[in-house]
Amino acid sequence: MNTEGESSKESLANREERILDFWKTHDIFQKSLKNREGKTLYSFYDGPPFATGLPHYGHLLAGTIKDVVGRFATMDGYYVPRRFGWDCHGVPVEYEVEKSLDLTTPGAIEDFGVAKFNEECRKIVFRYVDEWERYVHRLGRWVDFSVTWKTMDASFMESVWWVFRSLYDQGLVYEGVKVVPFSTKLGTPLSNFEAGQNYKEVDDPSVVIKFALHGDPASLLVWTTTPWTLVSNMAAAVGPEITYVRVADKVSGEQWILGQGCLSRWFSDPDSYEILESFLGTALVGKSYEPPFSFFEHKRAEGAYKILSGSFVEESEGTGVVHMAPAFGEADFFVCKEHHVPIVCPVDNHGCFTEEIPEYQGQYIKSCDKGIIKSLKNLGKVFYHGTVMHRYPFCWRTDTPLIYKTVNSWFVSVEKIKDKMLRANQKIHWVPEHIKEGRFGKWLDGARDWAISRNRYWGTPIPIWKSKEGEILVIGSVKELEELTGEKISDLHCHFIDQLKVEKEGKTFQRVPYVFDCWFDSGAMPYAQNHYPFENQKETEAGFPADFIAEGLDQTRGWFYTLTVISSALFDQTAFKNAIVNGIVLAEDGNKMSKRLNNYPSPMGIMNTYGADALRLYLLDSVVVKAEDLRFSDKGVESILKQILLPLTNVLSFFKTYTDLYGFDADNYDKEEITYSEIDRWILSNLYTVVGKVRESMSSYNLNTAVNPFVTFIDDLTNWYIRRCRRRFWESEDTPDRRAAFATLYEVLTVFCRVIAPFIPFISEDIYQQIKTEHSAESVHLCDFPHIDLAKVFPDLEQRMSDAREIVGLGHSLRKEHKLKVRQPLANFYIVGPKDRLDELTSFEQLIAEELNVKNIVFYKETPSFVKTTVKPNFRSLGRKVGEKIKDVQRALSNLSQDQIQQLLKQQYLLLNLGFEEITLGIDDVVISWETDPGYVARSSSLFTVVLDCQLTEDLIVEAISRELVNKINTMRRNHKLHVSDRILLQIHSSEDVEKAFLHYEDYICEETLTVQFEFKDSVEGEEWDINGHPTVIALTVASKAN
């Protein structure tokens, strides 16, 4: 047995640093991999972060989940390689460079030089790599940083080209013009799933404009929240099946047309207008109108400014008439295209009006809203002007408003493979389960073609070479490009290959000026990380689909989605079999964590203060692993440390103290000779039940339900088993009972440290190192995860102990409620319950008596005559539920029999007959109370009622004083930091009653406190105490120190 235990005074955070050094010095992670080489592969895809910023709690949460699953699978016998990868391309990197070089104006990057700009991007990609490694290392997460993959590596980029070429060969790639989300700050389109990542509640203009009809005295009332799009209006749409009304102002006679269902929204006074007629929307289709502005009046000849039929038009908001600017709305675009209405887009890539709108040329569109509204007011075309609060998409990276805009782009035909994606989703085990048909399934069901081209620079170039005649060549490999150009290729970034032209059949082909959406890189990761299919084919195919993946809820529209798109298209297969989806970690106030607002504690500071295990367990034992949001609290982490981890270290310290004192050789005790007590068998049964529960939860990837059993077990171990068995460990003689206690606790610790190893790897290692033998594995993380030992599982025993603890809990509640210290002995404790359960409790009679400090336990099958349980209405709950029937309920409750009340307690509900109807009452709808004879108090649970005899005799009062003395003297021993075997001398000054109690219980007090001599004096210099109302001074000195 290794007996070199560390000081219990050492902080857990410091112990973790020591354990990190141990893992590093002894190369434990690599040994854990080597131990499993040749075993069944467990494939795991790690979502790549950007190293342009520091890790936040979301990264640490996902990292913890991944680490737990990887460690568990390794301990369960699988080979689990854990490569780390880096996202290197795209907006996050470019944006950082733009800010640092002040390249904020249109054309600034071109002026600076694309080649120089890209190289600056390359330089900062790994700005925080060292910090990332430090955070991951400190968290206790095991990943291999020596074999990382990077999306900017030529090998990775070549595989991305292969993926694209494969999609193109299947007819899944096309060039087109569509309305897509567009970031004016970045000057590039975004994908629909990127646009869905950052919605905000914003105030926007709410304007109703009058479109004067030609040949009709009325005007259409048209609502919009984007006044800037009115300059590009090309049509108006009405719902063909919607009923419209023509109304006239009773004063001015002015006429307007709008949806009948929208009238009350815009006309608060029904007496102010008159309805002249009503008709279906089809009656309006084809009519022409006067547009709000005349910038594109010449487009009327091409079919502009007519009313179209639109099935998408609703009356739930607005006026029932939709203004259509087809360049800036997806539905507008398709309807106008179907009806051959011209499309105009007088907005450049930076969100500024072009020369087509001379009044506002060069101005940012949103800043023109006020001017446009003012102009329309001057023209008498504004019916209403206000504001509206609504959700609006913002750029996920720059946090600026997005617009929807027509762009020329390259698309992947996602809609063609939607059925494949839906089939793939059915093969995925999602945690939580509702993600499958909920957030992810619905997103797949509404999936749109993916705009994959970006007007940016630092990314994987789209490998399309195009001739002036419109012919295209799609390149799928470096070798192919080298053969077509005759040039040696070392780097695939655009500033290395854009000058390369392909001459073929008398035509010159030039690469199109786009890079891939960086999410395309990420979606290709399963193949590109291994340079598939150019290398590592066997390795890649063996690990596809991945056994496991884990990321945040936002990735259901991000990485989870792009992985599924590409794997479905290429292989008609899912990219991963199991997925854990976590929620978002918010600041404690419920807002998003913000560096600017400084509304969250430093992750590294939290780990260095409370320990990484405390942070890991806090996250794992919360709703955030069930895809719900968590308000982060450092007090929550501190609570985990104090209530769970420190008590567990105290168990280890307790075990080490007595094994070192009395000797316990784990290699040389004979298990067959051990006679286990009932409580030993209970804790071992409980232990192996926990093993089974954790295994079962981990097999279904339910980390939250995996954590709960072992957290509960720590409480069972510390607050019940150890507390109940202390005296057995204190025994100075080497008795069979002491050996059984040592053997039991040793087995518990050796098994339990392996159970918790994947979740809280530091404390598990600390326990293991202090109890391992010379024949043990070098580290707990080189051990197998334990299996349930059915021979040691006794469900009936666990149930009996659970009943006993429930009864003890009821008794303690009564003592607390009636201010009766546990150290005050009481005469009787009555237990009422089902006969079969009471019969099973007889063996625990002494245990219950000791726990509650009562002299006598009495079992009753029926409530004794001196106790009556009563039920009254909970007026706050029932008042809302039954209303005027509350008096009938009150009357019926007063007539309940004791049997009916017991049924209510057991079932937690009751069908209550009011005479004229039956209603269902829940336990929260009533207030339970107990009427007892004087001197008794009672309380019930669903199965048991307990009654405490509170009557105090002189003997009980004297005994209470003796117990209070023991408590205070042992408190002094702890304060003096005495060893558990140090003997002491006492001098005491107190009342005659205290002296009498001490002398009467002399043997008990001296044995419990290791007092070898005591003396009562008239005056003592010592510590002052209140002994049940008797002022007392106690002086303590050490008689003999332990060796």
Curated annotation (Swiss-Prot):
Chain span(s) of sequence motif 'HIGH' region: 49-59
The UniProt entry, under SUPFAM superfamilies, shows: Anticodon-binding domain of a subclass of class I aminoacyl-tRNA synthetases, Nucleotidylyl transferase, ValRS/IleRS/LeuRS editing domain
Cofactor(s), by name:
Zn(2+)
The Enzyme Commission number assigned here is: 6.1.1.5
Q: Which domain of life is it from?
A: Bacteria
Q: Where is this motif: 'KMSKS' region?
A: 592-596
Intracellular or extracellular location(s):
Cytoplasm
- Which BP terms from GO are recorded? isoleucyl-tRNA aminoacylation
A GO cellular component term found in this entry reads: cytoplasm
Q: What CDD domains does the record tag this protein with? A: Anticodon_Ia_Ile_ABEc, IleRS_core
- Its main localization is cytoplasm
Q: Which GO terms describe its molecular function?
A: aminoacyl-tRNA deacylase activity; ATP binding; isoleucine-tRNA ligase activity; tRNA binding; zinc ion binding
Residues holding ATP: K595
**Record keywords:** Aminoacyl-tRNA synthetase, ATP-binding, Cytoplasm, Ligase, Metal-binding, Nucleotide-binding, Protein biosynthesis, Zinc
InterPro entries found in the cross-reference section: aa-tRNA-synth_I_CS, aa-tRNA-synth_Ia, Anticodon_Ile_ABEc, Ile-tRNA-ligase, Ile-tRNA-ligase_type2, M/V/L/I-tRNA-synth_anticd-bd, Rossmann-like_a/b/a_fold, tRNAsynth_Ia_anticodon-bd
Q: Which reaction does it catalyse?
A: tRNA(Ile) + L-isoleucine + ATP = L-isoleucyl-tRNA(Ile) + AMP + diphosphate
* Comment on protein domains: IleRS has two distinct active sites: one for aminoacylation and one for editing. The misactivated valine is translocated from the active site to the editing site, which sterically excludes the correctly activated isoleucine. The single editing site contains two valyl binding pockets, one specific for each substrate (Val-AMP or Val-tRNA(Ile)).
Which PANTHER family does the record cross-reference, listed alphabetically?
ISOLEUCINE--TRNA LIGASE, CYTOPLASMIC, SOLEUCYL-TRNA SYNTHETASE
Q: How does it assemble?
A: Monomer.
Regarding protein family, the annotation reads:
Belongs to the class-I aminoacyl-tRNA synthetase family. IleS type 2 subfamily.
Query: What does the UniProt record say this protein does?
Result: Catalyzes the attachment of isoleucine to tRNA(Ile). As IleRS can inadvertently accommodate and process structurally similar amino acids such as valine, to avoid such errors it has two additional distinct tRNA(Ile)-dependent editing activities. One activity is designated as 'pretransfer' editing and involves the hydrolysis of activated Val-AMP. The other activity is designated 'posttransfer' editing and involves deacylation of mischarged Val-tRNA(Ile).
Query: What protein name does the entry list?
Result: Isoleucine--tRNA ligase
Organism, scientific name: Chlamydia caviae (strain ATCC VR-813 / DSM 19441 / 03DC25 / GPIC) (Chlamydophila caviae)
What's the gene?
Answer: ileS
